[in-house]
Amino acid sequence: MRQHRQFMDRTHYLLTFSSSETLLRLLLRIVDRAPKGRTFGDVLQPAKPEYRVGEVAEVIFVGANPKNSVQNQTHQTFLTVEKYEATSTSWQIVCNDASWETRFYWHKGLLGLSNATVEWHIPDTAQPGIYRIRYFGHNRKQDILKPAVILSFEGTSPAFEVVTI
């Protein structure tokens, strides 16, 4: 049996670790952070106001590590593309991250900051109309010496129009 080392932190909590590697792993865990003045899911780069069939709509959001969503079932997808239906005055999902027309890219930054880029390669079959892109994720928050908390968030792009050629 390995001998345990005891460490005292500045807040006077007694911690017991079986190895220095465990302490290092605890200290190196980086939580997700949003840029100052922003929250997770905020749009950093909106879509253009208008696209034609065959073009790529792209939106960049304040993101978080996608690994945080593995154990959480709040949302069943990282993204949706939705079309506004005037007759029902509601948004209808036309595709998600399982669709061939969509792409999701996570860009890891420094010190827990990251972005998520969502692309929709607008297919020839897309109906003209008003669309938006939504992003769903989970951010990891952890205070020193406390267990991590996983929080869900979502972001929605401003509406944009798809027109036919």
UniProtKB/Swiss-Prot annotation:
- Per the UniProt entry, what is one GO biological process? ceramide catabolic process
Where does it sit, as one GO cellular component term? Answer: membrane
One Pfam entry for this protein is: Ceramidse_alk_C
Q: Give the InterPro entries listed for this entry.
A: Ceramidase_alk (IPR006823), NCDase_C_sf (IPR038445), NEUT/ALK_ceramidase_C (IPR031331)
Give the top-rank taxon of the lineage listed in the UniProt record for this protein. Eukaryota
Q: What else is known?
A: ASAH2B/ASAH2L is a partial paralog of ASAH2, resulting from a partial duplication of ASAH2 on chromosome 10. It has a polymorphic start codon with a single nucleotide change of the original ASAH2 sequence plus other putative translation start site that might lead to several potential ORFs.
What is the protein named?
Putative inactive neutral ceramidase B
Q: Per UniProt, what is the name of the gene that codes for the protein in this document? A: ASAH2B
